[in-house]
């Protein structure tokens, strides 16, 4: 049980509290936080002031676009798998719990050459954190600009 150190009158009634909780719960669960792409999926976990936390799941043989962003940088932490990462014409392979920083304007891509899903936590930082802030140079799914 939770013990509150404030008088009941400061809380209002249980009915009002439950109505507020249910209203917010419905509002939250109406949002579609999981987005499916040809390469796998991503989940928006937390959206703050000028930052967004995502979980990327790149399916086996999945390849994201070779892309850049004008208004944000990204910091990736590999959670599962061994992705091949392109960053400004250099190639890296990362192990679980290793990181890589993608500066604003850098051309980058994630590839999963493996037989198991790659999972990456992505922190986006910037003034515009929308999917429209993207220039695609190469994309095996036909989405290049």
Where are the regions that the model predicts?
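Left-handed beta-helix
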Residues: 1-101, 108, 113, 129, ...
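Residues at the C-termini of beta-strands that transition into short coil/loop
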Residues: 5, 124, 138
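Noncatalytic linker/hinge segments flanking ATPase motor cores
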Residues: 94-99, 125, 141-145
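C-terminal structural segments of small proteins and small subunits
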Residues: 121-130
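Acidic/histidine-enriched, glycine/proline-rich intrinsically disordered or flexible terminal extensions
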Residues: 131-145
């Amino acid at each position: 049980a939770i013990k509150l150190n404030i008088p009941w009158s400061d809380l209002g009634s249980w009915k009002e509290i439950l109505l507020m909780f249910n209203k917010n719960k419905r509002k939250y669960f109406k949002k579609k936080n999981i987005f499916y792409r040809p390469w796998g999926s991503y989940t928006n976990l937390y959206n703050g002031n000028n930052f967004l936390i995502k979980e990327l799941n790149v399916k086996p043989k999945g390849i994201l676009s070779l892309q850049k962003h004008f208004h944000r940088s990204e910091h990736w932490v590999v959670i599962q798998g061994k992705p091949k990462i392109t960053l400004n014409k250099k190639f890296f392979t990362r192990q679980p719990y290793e990181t890589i920083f993608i500066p604003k304007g850098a051309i980058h891509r994630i590839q999963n050459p493996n037989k198991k899903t790659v999972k990456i936590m992505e922190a986006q930082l910037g003034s515009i954190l929308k999917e429209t802030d993207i220039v695609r140079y190469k994309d095996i799914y036909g989405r290049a600009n």
